[in-house]
Amino acid sequence: MINTTSRRKIEHLKLCAESPVEARGVSAGFEDVTLIHRALPELNMDELDLTVDFLGKRMQAPFLIASITGGHPDTLPVNAALAAAAEELGVGIGVGSQRAAIDDPAQEDSFRVVRDKAPNAFVYGNVGAAQIRQYGVEGVEKLIEMIDADALAIHLNFLQEAIQPEGDRDATGCLDMIAEICSMVRIPVIAKETGAGISREDALLLHKAGVSAIDVGGVGGTSWAGVEVYRAKESKDPVSERLGELFWDFGIPTVASLIESRVSLPLIATGGVRTGLDIAKSIALGASAASAALPFVGPSLEGKESVVKVLSCMLDEFRAAMFLCGCANIQALHNSPVVVTGWTLKYLEQRGFNVKDYSLPKNAL
């Protein structure tokens, strides 16, 4: 029998595949970022080095297929397709929240398939901050072992929890538990927002807690408040529907959050990353990697080859962006100048950030 958590997972997957769930009135901010074109790149585009070492694992490009799904029998072929594509192209991949497998061990195979299909890829596990207090270190270790994870993402999705009628709205003690997990588990811990962004204040707290990386998960991509609007309409829950509508675009856009979160930790740019140019802009702004989920949902329902096609296109775009910026490798892109304008510039100035440094060559990232 399918439990509530498992049923919710397949509902989320179907909604993301079939309904408009992206931010509506706010963008990730990539249009406010200009890379400096080099008319004389003096490089062979086919010889660029896109490889990167991320949290102890070599990847063929600084990109991860972000957490999408798992925890329902119908999600197994989806995760199989995503993982096989990640393995073929040498990028990383995260699993969806493993909570469903804790609630029902029969669902473990929908997560294990990721490691089975991607034996050499960087794979990260996934559990909610609201749940780690309940599971403790022992429970978290089981999640890690389930997929032989290279890292563990602890997702911070309190916006979604606030809107879900079944949401866990008690956020007390989460930071202390994150610190305990970081000190006890054998693999890196990633603090992962899921669409509302990370502020400077929280980045500093997470750094102090001992996380190894931050996934900024900013506004501009999938709105989980928006996803809950559709669920609320289906269940005829006007209170949750109103909350979701109100907070559909709530949070910090991805580009702004990237700069907010620069606290001497590796950063993952997630939220509205849709092209290889977005990946390049993210790396130039200081991210160690970029990731996306929604662009792969539809293709994953079709199979591995469809995922490979979409991902290959993004990586080709990324290679072209590096070439046109005169960057032979990822470190060169880290050090390349960018110009930040528009709404993002105004936001960052009001928050006290000096973005002029980004326009200087060899800026220290």
UniProtKB/Swiss-Prot annotation:
The molecule here is called Isopentenyl-diphosphate delta-isomerase
Record's subunit section: Homooctamer. Dimer of tetramers.
Q: Which residues form a coiled coil?
A: none
Q: Which UniProt keywords apply?
A: Cytoplasm, Flavoprotein, FMN, Isomerase, Isoprene biosynthesis, Magnesium, Metal-binding, NADP
Cofactor(s) this protein requires: FMN; NADPH; Mg(2+)
The protein's matches in PANTHER family, at most eight in alphabetical order, are given as: ISOPENTENYL-DIPHOSPHATE DELTA-ISOMERASE
Q: Which InterPro entries match?
A: Aldolase_TIM, FMN-dep_DH, IPdP_isomerase
GO CC annotations, alphabetized: cytoplasm
Q: Which reaction does it catalyse?
A: isopentenyl diphosphate = dimethylallyl diphosphate
The family assignment reads: Belongs to the IPP isomerase type 2 family.
**Residues at which Mg(2+) binds:** 161
Protein EC = 5.3.3.2
- List locations, semicolon-separated: Cytoplasm
Q: What is its main location?
A: cytoplasm
Q: What job does the chain carry out?
A: Involved in the biosynthesis of isoprenoids. Catalyzes the 1,3-allylic rearrangement of the homoallylic substrate isopentenyl (IPP) to its allylic isomer, dimethylallyl diphosphate (DMAPP).
Identify the residues that bind FMN.
67-69, 97, 126, 192, 222, 272-274, 293-294
Q: Single Gene Ontology BP term? A: isoprenoid biosynthetic process
